[in-house]
Regions:
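Glycine-rich phosphate-binding loop and adjoining helix at the ATP-binding site
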Residues: 86-141, 145-146
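N-terminal glycine/serine-rich phosphate-binding loop of ATP-dependent small-molecule kinases
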Residues: 1-97, 125
Length: 149
């Protein structure tokens, strides 16, 4: 028999589930973690600790005390908090904490600047939707202005 593995890396925890081929839950696990809030309305994750180590820990929890092996996995589904912004170096190592999706509002000023510069009509033409705190572009501009290194 084959098994399906699902992992969801969320804002405050990681959920994992193993299903058999009939989609019956064989095992599930949860690991709680916290976001970092360095300032009001700023929300971050330490990607190395929260995402990568958390992912490995949830996999370990799912495969502990089971009568099957990882080789029996026939499908994997993974989801995570997004859109998040995580700058990395040339070796894909995080340069700082990840800025979380729309709950982090530090780029509000950049949203206004871009919208003013392009105009709402042109912005909708290009982007097909207005910029929000979910948008990555304003976060890139925020980095450029505030953490250029």
């Amino acid at each position: 028999m084959g098994y399906l593995l699902g992992v969801d890396i969320g804002t405050q925890g990681i959920k994992g589930v193993l299903l058999d081929e009939t989609l019956k839950i064989v095992k599930k696990a949860y690991i709680e973690h916290n976001y970092i809030q360095p300032k009001a309305n700023w929300f971050e994750h330490d990607a190395e600790e929260t995402w990568w180590k958390g992912f490995k820990a949830i996999i370990q929890k799912l495969f502990t005390h089971n009568s099957f092996s990882p080789q029996e996995i026939i499908g994997i589904g993974c989801s995570g908090v997004s859109p998040c912004m995580l700058p990395v170096d040339s070796r894909d190592k995080p340069l700082r904490n990840a800025i979380l999706y729309g709950i982090d509002t530090r780029a509000q000023k950049e949203i206004s600047e871009i919208t003013q510069r392009l105009g709402e009509k042109k912005l909708l033409e290009i982007n097909k939707q207005p910029l929000t705190t979910q948008s990555v572009g304003p976060k890139i501009l925020w980095y450029k202005k505030n953490e250029p290194e």
